[in-house]
């Protein structure tokens, strides 16, 4: 029987690349969870497929903070796999919108996993946390690994610590098949220009087109960052749930 997968946050950079990967690599029925107000520019290239009759890619409109819509989406999709990628993912925004960041990232993750539990579904669930949970790391503690302590430095990072703990709770308390990742910064095509490397690239392109003065606005260039190409990241996420998955890891 054909496998079914639900991708939350399919209209985001990572979700759209994961959809691309699964369309090419599998014969699965793919369901993408998106909000009614979600911009679709990252998935414009997929809309023709979505609109086809009996398409293997379907969008389900729901909100992580609306139980009835989550329940309906899960009842329709009956997923074998869930990739939970939906999040408010910009740390700077989280300082200005802490409540909505917590509601989406922390409470939203709880709502999704609890809805799965209430329906007694048994999918493998990838909960996408973030390396931001480690925050400021001392030089002597490098390189970072899974045993590093939480040291969040933003409301976003705090929300992802909550996401981590929610995933662990549902695994330990109810035996749900949850796997958690703390990937470092994703970069690549479709990366928003509010993020550093995309902002630099955009400014350079505008300078070369003589549309702005030859001056690049930057932030703190002394911080050390680890980047992962989004196409490598979604390959890792695919393998996480399909190649000897180990819930609780």
Regions found by a protein language model. Give the residues of each.
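NAD(P)-dependent short-chain dehydrogenase/reductase
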Residues: 137-143, 165-241
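N-terminal Rossmann-like NAD(P)+-binding domain of SDR-like oxidoreductases, especially those catalyzing
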Residues: 1-186
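Short, intrinsically disordered, charge-balanced linker/junction segments flanking boundaries
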Residues: 244-249
